[in-house]
Amino acid sequence: MRSEFWQNILDRAGKSEDGKQLPFFSLAPMEAVTDVVFRHVVSSAAEPEVFYTEFTNASSFASPKGIHSTRGRLTFTPDESEKLIAQIWGSRQADIEFMSQELPKLGFQAIDLNFGCPDKAVVKSGGGSGMIRTPALAEEIITAAKTSGLPVSVKTRLGYSRPEEFHEWLKFLLGQDVEVLTVHLRTKKEMSKVPAHFELIDEIVKMRDEVAPNTLLQINGDIKNHQQGMELWRAHSGVDGIMIGRGIFEDPFCFEKFDIEHSRQDYMNLLNQHLDLFDKHNTEASPRKFEPLKRFFKIYVRNFKGASDLRARLMLTKNTSEVRQILTEFGENYEDMMENYARISEEYHKNKNSEEV
């Protein structure tokens, strides 16, 4: 029986004109990226049906010393509760059980277990894609998470070293009665260095249909936007969800259902919103470091003349006030700058043509 949380997700995804269930879209959980601030920025640009928190270590959460450092990762606002999933990881059954049972008290309605992170430190500790090599432990971790009473899902990879490992590994996971199985279509060894194995989607769908027809299947890897996701869904019947990860860095509007051209000001508005939200959530109780904010500048400051110079200036800032000042100056001088670009370009082409003659 499907949980109310996931049924609501499917209902929000809607039906096609012929009555077929449309896929739900989600933003992949990403370290130091998918926090409460960025999730709200993405929502305002084009909202997917599902969000995930940054992945949070259960052992740190269970530790008296680490509990405060992990709480910030789990911060969310009331309007997110119907679409936000807490993604957790770890290799200690007791810690997973403790954290899973605490999550409902924090207001979470669903849990996702990270069995796919390829980070060396995570894998060495037995977590992330290290679980692929220890299925017995993976089963214990899933069982521990289920003690929360919340719907439990798993995000993983095809295998550890070889794509063919999916035959055993994914079949094993499908036998664990998880609500959703998200498959990053690469192995741990492949990282993101090779193209995602879209050619295996149909085999995975068939396996799901045979082993666990009630488990929702979500695919991830090399999917840049909503349009590409829909193309994959149409080409591979049986896929229930589409997860976009790095595509968000190329286009913050990637969840838009139609290809819309956005102006420079549209991107600047998102950046200003990000700054406002950063300041709003930067409190004494939950202080935020400014330096990590700089990694987001390239998402918004791109694909227009002067973007490279503007980014270079922004990277030298020390606080949001300095960023706002530079953005204001840039906006006020933009028209003059464009005239200079046009003049320089015209002179360049004149000189080039005269040389050719």
Regions found by a protein language model. Give the residues of each.
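Glycine-rich, positively charged N-terminal anion/phosphate-binding segment
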Residues: 2-16, 30-102
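Alpha/beta catalytic cores of nucleotide-metabolism and tRNA/nucleoside-modifying enzymes
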Residues: 1-21, 25-26, 31, 37, ...
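Alpha/beta enzyme core
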Residues: 97-111, 115-125, 136-217
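Active-site beta-loop-alpha junctions enriched in small/polar residues
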Residues: 30-32, 56-58, 89-91, 116-118, ...
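Hydrophobic faces of well-ordered beta-strands that scaffold small-molecule active sites
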Residues: 25-28, 51-53, 84-88, 111-113, ...
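Short glycine-enriched, charge-decorated loop/helix-capping segments at active-site entrances
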Residues: 126-132, 190-191, 259-261
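An active-site metal/cofactor-coordinating segment within enzyme catalytic domains
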Residues: 66-67, 77, 120-129
